[in-house]
A protein has these predicted regions:
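Amphipathic, hydrophobic secondary-structure cores in small proteins
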Residues: 20-78, 82
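Short acidic/polar alpha-helix capping motifs at helix-coil junctions
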Residues: 1-4, 76-78
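Long, charge-rich, low-complexity intrinsically disordered regions
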Residues: 2-9, 86-88
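Short, Lys/Arg-enriched anionic-surface-contact patches
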Residues: 6-19
Length: 88
């Protein structure tokens, strides 16, 4: 995420943790295990707790206003996972 985008997010009314989560999610991970290790190291959260916070965050309008493309992508991914689960 660029410095300009990060400054826009910080001025959006989100908490520092929420800004860090959005910034973290803007990265791409090749392996799921690497991402989960980074979650523990950077946020001192378990992966399930991190994803609970993320799911709550991407439903909020201030997150959408701060990082619309990222939030839309995360919402699409979540919806696809939910549809795949319900199709089983």
């Amino acid at each position: 995420m660029s410095a300009v985008e990060n400054n826009e997010i910080q001025s959006s009314g989100l908490t520092d943790l929420e800004v860090r989560i959005l910034d973290f999610e803007s990265n791409w991970w090749r392996f799921a295990g690497a991402k989960e290790s980074a979650i523990k190291e950077l946020f001192d959260l378990t992966a399930p707790r991190y994803y609970q916070l993320l799911n709550d965050l991407i439903d909020r309008e201030d997150a959408m206003a701060a990082a619309p493309m990222l939030v839309k992508r995360l919402r699409r991914l979540r919806e696809a996972r939910m549809q795949a689960r319900s199709a089983r």
